[in-house]
Amino acid sequence: MKKILALVLALVLSLSLAAAEDLKVIRVGATAAPHAEILESEAVTAKLAELGYKLDVVVYDGYVLENPAVSDGTDMANYFQHQPYLDSYNATVDEKDQLVGAFSVHYEPFGIYSDSLKSLEELKDGAYIGVPNDPSNETRALLLLAAVGLISVPEGANAESVLTKYDITDEMNPRGFKFEEVAAELLPSTLPDYDIAVINGNYAIDAGLKPAVDALALEASDSAFAVLYANVVAVRAEDVDSEWLAALKTALTTEEARQYMNDTYAGGVVPTF
């Protein structure tokens, strides 16, 4: 009996391995959190397996190499960026190397955080505020500060504007806040240096912050930023209508994938589907 059971188990295992080997591979570049985590979640991988595919997720430490790796065919797709970032990449390369944002998956809201304050009502005049030092993210930070009533911004400024602290006049900043421009990825670790800081969703998650719990304020999920800065899966134009991309889209936009994002990231990752 034991020999028969062992043979049955061996047969089941061999069939399972054979089935796994039959799955077609989709190689996707991603940053660690939350992108690679989402791709490697049971919600996504199980659905892909049903559709006949499995993922080879290549984790990158930074953004610089991810788009070129898709352009040159090293990776089949990537998942780490919003459309404005992709547009800026496409503007720097030959047409043959340009990529397409095939579909959006999620949005990472900016939040206002503090190491010392429990609410924005505690913020004193003249306080120090850390903001990202790159144009698109500093714009988002200043617009969020305006949305919660701490400052005002030039008339007509919106999600597609480019703003820096130098655009905020004394009249727009009657409480005399002092803005410190810092590399976005450093803001979580330097949070104790400021009274408040405006931090990207992915960097907040990396630092162990829970946006829905720890943020003093968050960008509205129905804001223009939620559309403009939704994170997309990027591919070569020739792959837009491929079967493997359709399978990847299906797997990333199921109700199970939505539930995983909502349960795991506490408001730091908002599904856009």
Label the predicted regions.
Residues 32-56:
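Short, polar/charged alpha-helical segment
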Residues 108-120, 228-242:
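A bilobed periplasmic-binding-protein/Venus flytrap-type ligand-binding module shared by bacterial periplasmic
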Residues 88-102, 115-117, 193, 198, ...:
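Ligand-binding "clamshell"
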Residues 61-63, 73-74, 78-88, 183-184, ...:
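Beta->alpha turn/N-cap motifs
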